[in-house]
């Protein structure tokens, strides 16, 4: 499984990327708005830090507007992936963009049917939102299992990005089910690193080393 970072915060991206585990970044209008900066400027700066796919989302509702915005965003850097909402207009945009060689990430997917349609339209990535499904008392991981099964059955090449990740268990379950990617908030990535027994072990080693009076 690959890890993307789900943020538009430059400092978080720099810190996470330095760990050597991040393969890409996903953003959305809400994340960019939180930074209070120019959209294209933020995306451009991310592209200077991360050597991998960077998802930037369109705002228009109609496919003509989506395609126009996508073409502009794609000019920023070769690694830009265009996030397109899962709507009929979105599918039209994906169909056009895929024929132009522009990579797309279809977002706000809440069913396996939606993922299948997005992939058939030419999406490079599909992003099912597991956390938001959990929020409405639905098993969010079931959609990952369903999409993995369908894509495997028909040798569909679109990659599955597990999105709306709320905690490390979401990542673990998605990895066990075979999702290609998990896009995680910075907070969740930090939670994945930590374990109380690791901290206890480190302190015990330090104490034993100090008692023995050893040096490197």
UniProtKB/Swiss-Prot annotation:
Pathway: Carbohydrate degradation; pentose phosphate pathway; D-glyceraldehyde 3-phosphate and beta-D-fructose 6-phosphate from D-ribose 5-phosphate and D-xylulose 5-phosphate (non-oxidative stage): step 2/3. The keyword Transmembrane helix does not apply. Its main location: cytoplasm. One of its GO terms (biological process) is pentose-phosphate shunt. InterPro entries: Aldolase_TIM, TAL/FSA, Transaldolase_3B, Transaldolase_3B/F6P_aldolase, Transaldolase_AS, TSA/FSA_arc/bac. One of its GO terms (cellular component) is cytoplasm. It holds the Pfam family TAL_FSA. It is an enzyme of class 2 (transferase). It is found in: Cytoplasm. Keywords: Cytoplasm, Pentose shunt, Schiff base, Transferase. It catalyses: D-sedoheptulose 7-phosphate + D-glyceraldehyde 3-phosphate = D-erythrose 4-phosphate + beta-D-fructose 6-phosphate. The active site is at 83 (schiff-base intermediate with substrate). PROSITE patterns: TRANSALDOLASE_1. Its EC number is 2.2.1.2. GO terms for molecular function: aldehyde-lyase activity; transaldolase activity. PANTHER family: TRANSALDOLASE (PTHR10683:SF36). Belongs to the transaldolase family. Type 3B subfamily. NCBIfam families: fsa_talC_mipB. Transaldolase is important for the balance of metabolites in the pentose-phosphate pathway. This is Probable transaldolase. The gene is tal.
């Amino acid at each position: 499984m690959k890890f993307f970072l789900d943020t538009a915060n430059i400092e978080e991206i720099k810190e996470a990327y330095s760990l050597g585990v991040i393969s890409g970044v996903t953003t959305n209008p809400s994340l960019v708005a939180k930074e209070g900066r120019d959209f294209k400027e933020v995306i451009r700066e991310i592209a200077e830090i991360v050597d991998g796919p960077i998802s930037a989302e369109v705002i228009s509702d109609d496919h003509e507007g989506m395609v126009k915005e996508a073409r502009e965003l794609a000019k920023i850097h070769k690694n830009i992936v265009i996030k397109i909402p899962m709507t009929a207009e979105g599918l039209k945009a994906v169909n056009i963009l895929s024929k132009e060689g522009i990579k797309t990430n279809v977002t706000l997917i809440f069913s396996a049917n939606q993922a299948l349609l997005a992939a058939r339209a030419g999406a490079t990535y599909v992003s099912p939102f597991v956390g938001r499904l959990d929020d409405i008392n639905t098993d969010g991981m079931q959609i990952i299992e369903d999409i993995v099964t369908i894509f495997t059955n028909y040798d569909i090449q679109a990659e599955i990005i597990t999105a709306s990740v709320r905690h490390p268990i979401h990542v673990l379950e998605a990895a066990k089910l075979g999702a290609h990617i998990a896009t995680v908030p910075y907070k969740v990535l930090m939670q994945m690193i930590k374990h109380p027994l690791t901290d206890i072990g480190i302190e015990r080693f330090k104490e034993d080393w100090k008692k023995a009076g050893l040096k490197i």
